Amino acid sequence: MAKSVVIAEKPSVARDIARVLKCDKKGNGYLEGSKYIVTWALGHLVTLADPESYDVKYKKWNLEDLPMLPERLKLTVIKQTGKQFNAVKSQLLRKDVNEIIVATDAGREGELVARWIIDKVRINKPIKRLWISSVTDKAIKDGFANLKPGKAYDNLYASAVARSEADWYIGLNATRALTTRFNAQLNCGRVQTPTVAMIANREDEIKNFKAQTYYGIEAQTTNQLKLTWQDANGNSRSFNKEKIDGIVKGLDKHNATVLEIDKKQKKSFSPGLYDLTELQRDANKKFGYSAKETLNIMQKLYEQHKVLTYPRTDSRYISSDIVGTLPERLKACGVGEYRPLAHKVLQKPIKANKSFVDDSKVSDHHAIIPTEGYVNFSAFTDKERKIYDLVVKRFLAVLFPAFEYEQLTLRTKIGNETFIARGKTILHAGWKEVYENRFEDDDVTDEVKEQLLPRIEKGDTLTVKLIMQTSGQTKAPARFNEATLLSAMENPTKYMDTQNKQLADTLKSTGGLGTVATRADIIDKLFNSFLIEKRGKDIHITSKGRQLLDLVPEELKSPTLTGEWEQKLEAIAKGKLKKEVFISEMKNYTKEIVSEIKSSDKKYKHDNISTKSCPDCGKPMLEVNGKKGKMLVCQDRECGHRKNVSRTTNARCPQCKKKLELRGEGAGQIFACKCGYREKLSTFQERRKKESGNKADKRDVQKYMKQQKKEEEPLNNPFAEALKKLKFD
């Protein structure tokens, strides 16, 4: 009997699919049943070949050998996962297999994972596509009942290949050109470089910002009401101190007369459902989680616990076909503290409205929402619980009615000047009930603070007991943190020097710099290549990042290039542009970039050279700030030796409770804190033992230290090798 091979992206998803399809016979890298064979990738099993596979001379990085422009780019099996590739290959080549079902992630990159495997195996069998947004049993069954023809996704595959090949031509050539021309470990890409440029621009704005003092007037009445002065244009601030001084002087011994009380009934609706970027932003703001950490937690909640839908989505809407499943999802997530809220929503039929249901705004995947799967809170880690809580509360909030309130604006006259006060009466808590009325609005910028207003009628006279001048200073723009950098990457149009509205709109519609799936990796890569560094929560550009921006061609610094690329990649995905035309343009652009770098007369200055020499090659080591602490890195890119000087650990200072830094090597290692606390590693081991009631032994501490090491950047990987593996998305 003929069988179908199903290719999943990961073993965990493969196991779920195999269970539903009753494939319980275990093989080497696959699971088999009577009709289906389920096998899996491990992310990418196949990638574009390294430059030296085209010509042995490319093994060495020489400026004169650039640009590298092979006619056709070849595919190669990734060595580390070669065993699994062979397992997939053997199943695809089986004579009893007459059909391939692509069940990798539903999106551009997922398409590439499976199709590159199929292309490398050189197999020509009919292809079908499983396109689902969650891996619950129901979603898998429904998906297999509605398989799509593989041909429907040929253009999406072409778009993915075009993106990958363009990154190879431009990314590898630009990186080699910069590194060899300036004798420094420099890498750039169409997303990385404009992201660094945005951080640099923000720092320039802060540096050039000149604070101005502004003035206002506040009056206090005997019935504890605070009145705020406003000019004829409704402004509460003035930069003219003399003017404010004069007004305050002229108001002496005047009372306030109530001119009008304006009552307006207002509504505010819940913020939209989460896409990945919005969730990463909120998790960073509320819990300090990095973008990468949030994605990893989401992946567990999606794959392992099966309680949330596909995480790598850029949509904040659901499609109309999902509306019918909402009651089941509410029943599944409506347990524990969410039970009363879910019960309230289920009392009435759910009304789909455009604020969260819009087919036109859902492409590959809908917004992140709960699945119909059983929720076992006891299986969650603390971090998983927090992320799950964010998603469920947002899901419930969207299904709750609007927050309704009556806004009262009190307009009074003191002398010839207008003073106002503002208050609010809640009519219906609506969706704010989900957040126990503690939801904070980021967009509230009103100068006039709301207060509890006493009973007042129009025409009343209020006794003024105090009139005082207020003052403040304008603030410089805030430095980026991971939350705000994600926002800037998602919508970089304000940083673009272009009058092309269509291009700006495309960047906005295609999700800005990078994709929801790649932004976390890009930010991580910028930290690990020492172009940016973290001080507290703030992100700062390093000297290396500054110099890189000075050395790269101008176009690579602007989001415009990404806008143009995304416009064309979208056209390829829609069948409106040939992949070959796009790649030809990219090759020509590569020639221009390399030529510009070659002819540059600029210099790169290592201003972080330490007194230490590299133990491998003897050259001076550079001192850099990694994401987890200080490191020494060999300045020779071909050597690439790295050594930790200190790293931030999860151990807490017993005095101030901040994270401790671990410095030194071996038995001489010492924990240090910014508050001045110091503790030897041996003393730390003893303290941990006592705190845990003498249960901790040497093995426990070694396990703890091993966990810390796992969180470090990889050490002593030759930089050239690392660059080869970089994806310049």
Curated annotation (Swiss-Prot):
Gene3D superfamilies: 3.40.50.140, Topoisomerase I, domain 2 (1.10.460.10), Topoisomerase I, domain 3 (2.70.20.10), Topoisomerase I, domain 4 (1.10.290.10)
Region (Disordered): 686-718
Any one cellular-component term (Gene Ontology): cytoplasmic replication fork
Annotated ranges, domain Toprim: 3-136
Catalytic activity: ATP-independent breakage of single-stranded DNA, followed by passage and rejoining
Single annotated GO MF: magnesium ion binding
Interaction with DNA as annotated region, ranges: 187-192
UniProt site (Interaction with DNA): 61, 168, 176, 312
UniProt binding sites for Mg(2+): 9, 105
Gene Ontology biological-process entries: DNA recombination; DNA repair; DNA topological change
Short name of any one Pfam family annotated for the protein: Toprim
Needed co-factor(s): Mg(2+)
Residue stretches making up the Topo IA-type catalytic domain: 153-594
Comp. bias regions, Basic and acidic residues: 686-713
Residues annotated as catalytic: 310
Entry EC no(s): 5.6.2.1
Superkingdom of origin: Bacteria
SUPFAM superfamilies: Prokaryotic type I DNA topoisomerase
Matches recorded under InterPro entries: Topo_IA, Topo_IA_2, Topo_IA_AS, Topo_IA_cen, Topo_IA_cen_sub1, Topo_IA_cen_sub2, Topo_IA_cen_sub3, Topo_IA_core_domain
Keyword terms: DNA-binding, Isomerase, Magnesium, Metal-binding, Topoisomerase
Family: Belongs to the type IA topoisomerase family.
UniProt cross-references to PANTHER family, sorted A to Z: DNA TOPOISOMERASE 3-ALPHA, PROKARYOTIC DNA TOPOISOMERASE
Function: Releases the supercoiling and torsional tension of DNA, which is introduced during the DNA replication and transcription, by transiently cleaving and rejoining one strand of the DNA duplex. Introduces a single-strand break via transesterification at a target site in duplex DNA. The scissile phosphodiester is attacked by the catalytic tyrosine of the enzyme, resulting in the formation of a DNA-(5'-phosphotyrosyl)-enzyme intermediate and the expulsion of a 3'-OH DNA strand. The free DNA strand then undergoes passage around the unbroken strand, thus removing DNA supercoils.
Protein name: DNA topoisomerase 3
Originating organism: Bacillus cereus (strain ZK / E33L)
